[in-house]
Amino acid sequence: MKKIALFNHQPECSIECCNGIIRALSSQYEVKLFTIQDDLDEVLNDVDGIVFPGGIGDSDSYHDFFTRSKANKIAAFLDRGGRYIGICMGAYWAGSRYFDFLDGIDAVQYIKRPTAEIRRSYGTVADIEWLGQKEKMFFYDGCVFTGSGYYDTIAKYANDEPMAIIQGNLGLIGCHPESEEFWYESPYQ
């Protein structure tokens, strides 16, 4: 069974996001949780991928967690063939203001796009198309991917902009496919 490392730091990385990811992936992957206190070399030593979940993290919390040295260790892990999964906040963190892993594209705030049908950052349900199938997915100030670099679009928002992409060994998702059923109930919307 392949092993993935899942970043967990309350409250910036929601424990609910981590629990949803564990439930979704634990039948196919051994999930190893890690925090900012863990030695990143040890964390990355025996895993196939690293996962950064959603949460309330922003640029301030990112820079509190990840020095350039730690970011370089993750970049070296990717260069060795490791995989990166970023959901919502984790997808933003792959962008130019943070880890800077994307090539020719960036992760930007969806609600600020001129044709976005969602205009506020609070939790709601987004209409998306995932591999050609219409779906509804939990959205909480997620990102969209812009730019001229090459990537494969896995899912799109209602305005046809990319919501989930694969670029090389990065898998990035703006919404929350790991969402639990209760997320769709008040007060989360």
Predicted regions, residues:
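N-terminal beta1-alpha1 cap of cysteine-dependent amidohydrolase-like domains
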Residues: 1-46
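A structural signal for short, well-ordered beta-strand segments and their strand-loop junctions
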Residues: 6, 32-35, 85-87, 171-174
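Flexible loop residues that form catalytic
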Residues: 9, 55, 178
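Short catalytic/ligand-binding loop motif for oxyanion handling, primarily in non-cytosolic enzymes
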Residues: 14, 59-60, 93-96, 161-163, ...
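Structural motif
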Residues: 49-55, 170-174
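Acyltransferase
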Residues: 184-189
